[in-house]
Amino acid sequence: MEVTCLLLLALIPFHCRGQGVYAPAQAQIVHAGQACVVKEDNISERVYTIREGDTLMLQCLVTGHPRPQVRWTKTAGSASDKFQETSVFNETLRIERIARTQGGRYYCKAENGVGVPAIKSIRVDVQYLDEPMLTVHQTVSDVRGNFYQEKTVFLRCTVNSNPPARFIWKRGSDTLSHSQDNGVDIYEPLYTQGETKVLKLKNLRPQDYASYTCQVSVRNVCGIPDKAITFRLTNTTAPPALKLSVNETLVVNPGENVTVQCLLTGGDPLPQLQWSHGPGPLPLGALAQGGTLSIPSVQARDSGYYNCTATNNVGNPAKKTVNLLVRSMKNATFQITPDVIKESENIQLGQDLKLSCHVDAVPQEKVTYQWFKNGKPARMSKRLLVTRNDPELPAVTSSLELIDLHFSDYGTYLCMASFPGAPVPDLSVEVNISSETVPPTISVPKGRAVVTVREGSPAELQCEVRGKPRPPVLWSRVDKEAALLPSGLPLEETPDGKLRLERVSRDMSGTYRCQTARYNGFNVRPREAQVQLNVQFPPEVEPSSQDVRQALGRPVLLRCSLLRGSPQRIASAVWRFKGQLLPPPPVVPAAAEAPDHAELRLDAVTRDSSGSYECSVSNDVGSAACLFQVSAKAYSPEFYFDTPNPTRSHKLSKNYSYVLQWTQREPDAVDPVLNYRLSIRQLNQHNAVVKAIPVRRVEKGQLLEYILTDLRVPHSYEVRLTPYTTFGAGDMASRIIHYTEPINSPNLSDNTCHFEDEKICGYTQDLTDNFDWTRQNALTQNPKRSPNTGPPTDISGTPEGYYMFIETSRPRELGDRARLVSPLYNASAKFYCVSFFYHMYGKHIGSLNLLVRSRNKGALDTHAWSLSGNKGNVWQQAHVPISPSGPFQIIFEGVRGPGYLGDIAIDDVTLKKGECPRKQTDPNKVVVMPGSGAPCQSSPQLWGPMAIFLLALQR
C-alpha cells in the first residue's frame, strides 16, 4: 500500500510543460495611494496628479521570465529647478510628503536579460497653491493744466500655483468685475513672474477707499482650499521712506562698538524693517532690533555692505545701504622693476630702477606710504621720485623711482604704510639694493624631478630658488586643465619652495609647475620648473568574486586579470584553496614578459576539488584577490510568477491549492537535476512540510509545475525549492505565496468564494439599495457589536476566516435593504446550482433573498429563494436551482427586521453547472491542515485509468 501511495504521489501532482517560457520583460505603471486626479484623456501622455504634501505611490507591474528587475528613474518637470535623477530598485515607488520640485516624468525600466528592457513612463503633476501676495502702486498725474491731479491706484495680486489659479477681486464683500464701471479695470500684465492679476482704480473716488480682497482658487483641485489676502486702502496709504543716522560709508577702527539706526520717515501701513548683510549673513554677535543695528567690538572681517529694507506692500521697498569699513592692513609686498624701457631684467648702473610697495588695506585709498633709505627718510630729487597709483601696478601702490642708478644709490630701502591718526599698527617692508641683487633662477634638486610615493602617504615636491632677494614659489597643476591643488586653490604660495601634500591619492598623480612670484622680488618674467608626482597604488583585479559551476569530471580554467594599478604589472601571484597554499602553476612563456593575469587550471571538478579558490595578486605596492567558488552545485530554480489563476479554492473546506511553476536556471551547466526538495511553511509558524519531487531530464526553458494542496485560507506560505544532482543539494530559491480569492465563474466546476480577499470575488455593492454588506471576521468585528445576533466566526470556525454580513443597528430602519451583486456570467448550460451557507440568528431577523438578474433583454430581477426569521446560532447550507435564459448575475438581498438584533451573514458561495444535490451538506465539515492528510491524496480530476490500474495490480 505504501509503495502505491508513493508512486501516486510522484505521478499525480507533478507536471512538465513545454519549453521556451523565457519571455522578455513587460511593464505597466499603476498608481495607488493619495492620488487626487488622474488625467488619461491622451493615451500617449499619462498624467498622475497629486497634491503637494501627499504620498506618491506608483507600482510597476511586470511580467516576463525570469522575474524582471525594476528600476525607477526620474527627469525634471516644469516645476523643478534643474535636471534631477534618482534610482529606486523596487517595484513600488513611494515618496512621502511629495514636493513640487519632485514633479516630472517617472520611468519604470524592467529587464530580465531576455530581449530588450521594457520602459514605461508617467508624468507626475504636483498640485499646490501658495499664499497670495498683494502690492499697491500709486501714480499721480496733472490734468488740464494743473487745475487738479488724478490719482490712480494699482493693486497687484501674485500667486504661485499649479494648476493656474483663478482670481476674484472683492471690495468689501462685493465682487468686482472687469469694466464694472469707469473707475475699475482688471487685467493681466505681460512678462510677469508667476500668475498676476492687477486691479486698477482710475481717478480715485471716495468710494474707492475701502478694503480690497484678492481671492485665489484652483477650483478645489485635489481638495486645495481657496486662499485670500486683504488690503485696506485709505487716503493716507503711502510707500515707505527711510533715512540713516550715519553716512552711507562708515569707517571705524577695529574693536569699536558700531550702532546704525534706520529711521522711518513715511509709510502707511506701518512698514516692516529688516537688516541684511552682503556677502553672507549678519556677523555673530550682531543684534538687529527694529531699525537699530548693533555690532559690538567690530573686526576687519565684519566689513561689508549692510542693508536696511522697509516694506509695507505699497510701492517699491525702501532701501538704504551702509558700507562699513573697518580699518585694517595686511600683506605688505614689494617689487623690484629694472629699466622697463631697455627691457632689462638686471640691475645695472646707469639704468633706471623702480621699487614698489603695496599693502592690502581697508579703506585702500586712506593708506599713506613713507620711504626710508638706510634708516633715514628718503629725500626727493631729480633722480629720486616717489609716485603713487602706477597704472601697471595694483591700486594705491607707492613707487620709488631711481633715475640713472649710481653706486651711491645702493643701500637698504624701507617702505612704511600707515593709517594717520588711527590705532592700526604700521606695516613695513625692506628692500636691499646692491651689486649682489640679482633676478631669481629656479630649478629642481637632483633626484627630485620625479617623486614616487604610495597612496595614502605624505609627499613633498621641492623647487630651489636662487637669487637675491628670493621670491616666493607658486605651485599649480600642469597636465589637468582647471585642476585644483589639494588645498582647493588653483595656485598655492610656498615661501621655501616646498609643496607639502598629506595623504596623497591616485588622482593627484601628474605634473606640477613651480614658478617664481613677481612680488617680494624682481618684477620680471617668472622662472619655471616642473616636478612629476607618481602615486603608486595597489592593483585592482577582476573578477573580485566569481561563482564557477561545472559538471563533475569537467575541466575548469580560473583567470585573475589585472585591471589597473601602479605599477601596472603583476609582480607575484599566489593561489590558495580553502586557505591552503597551492604550488605555483606553470608559467606560459608569452605571458611571462608582461603578465597581466594569472591562471589556474583544474583538470576535473570533483567533490574534493570543489570549494573556495583565492588568487592573491601583488604589484610590490599592495595586493588584491580574486575569489572563485568552484562547485558542481545546480543553480537555483526560477519561479514563474505569471501563472494564470494559480489559486484554487475548495467549497467543502476552508482550504485552497496553489499551482507552483518554475524553470531551472542553466540546467546544462552542471549535472542533470534528479529531484527537487520542496519545503512549505505557513508564515508566523516554525514547522515546515518537506516533500521530494522526482524529475526526468530538465531542459532550459522547460516549465515545471507542482500543485500545493491543503493550504489554509487565508494564510500565506513560504515556499523553498532546492534542486538535487549527483553532486548534492544546489542553490535554494524561496518565495511567498498569498491567497487571492478567485473570481466566481460558472465555467469552473469547483469554485467557491470564501470572501477571504478584499476583492470579494468580483462581487459589488448595489448602488440603489439602502446600505451595504460588510466583510469581516472574528478579529476585525466591532467589539461593541450587538450580542445575541450574528455569527461568532465564519463557516470554518477559525477567527481569521471572513464572511459577509449586514449590520442592522442604527441608523438602519425596518425594511432597509442591502444588495450584494455577483459578476456577470455567460449562460452556457440550462441549469445551475447556487450553494451557500447562511447564518440568521436573532429575534429581529428579517429576510434573506436570492435574486437572479437576467441580462438578455434589459435588467430583470427574479426571486429564486427567500428565508425569514430566526434560524439559530448555527451555519446552515442552502442549494438553490436556477435556470437563466441568458447572461445573468446573482444577488444576495438582506432585509432589515423590526429591531437591531437581526444581523444576517453568508459565506462560501458556489455557482456550478447542473442540478442541485438532493441532500443538504453537513455544515460541520472537517478542515484538513497542510500535510496532515494521507500522503496519497490528490485532486479528483487526476484519478484516471492509471490509478485504477495500480489499485488492481495491488490486489
Swiss-Prot record:
Annotated organism of origin: Homo sapiens (Human)
Main subcellular location: membrane
Propeptide: 933-955
Record localization: Cell membrane
Membrane topology label: Lipid-anchor; GPI-anchor
Positions of the MAM domain: 751-918
Biased composition, class Polar residues, residue ranges: 779-788
Protein's job: Required for radial migration of cortical neurons in the superficial layer of the neocortex. Plays a role in the formation or maintenance of inhibitory synapses. May function by inhibiting the activity of NLGN2.
Glycosylation sites noted in the Swiss-Prot or TrEMBL record: N42, N90, N235, N247, N257, N307, N331, N432, N655, N747, N826
Tissue specificity of this protein: Has been found in brain, heart, skeletal muscle and kidney. Found to be overexpressed in tumor tissues.
Entry-linked CDD domains: FN3, Ig, MAM
GO biological process, one term: regulation of synaptic membrane adhesion
Cystine residue pairs: C60-C108, C157-C214, C262-C308, C357-C415, C463-C514, C560-C615
UniProt cross-references to Pfam families, sorted A to Z: I-set, Ig_3, MAM
Segments passing through the bilayer: none
Positions of the UniProt region annotated as Disordered: 779-798
Name of the protein: MAM domain-containing glycosylphosphatidylinositol anchor protein 1
Lipid anchor positions (GPI-anchor amidated serine): S932
Domain called Fibronectin type-III: residue spans: 643-743
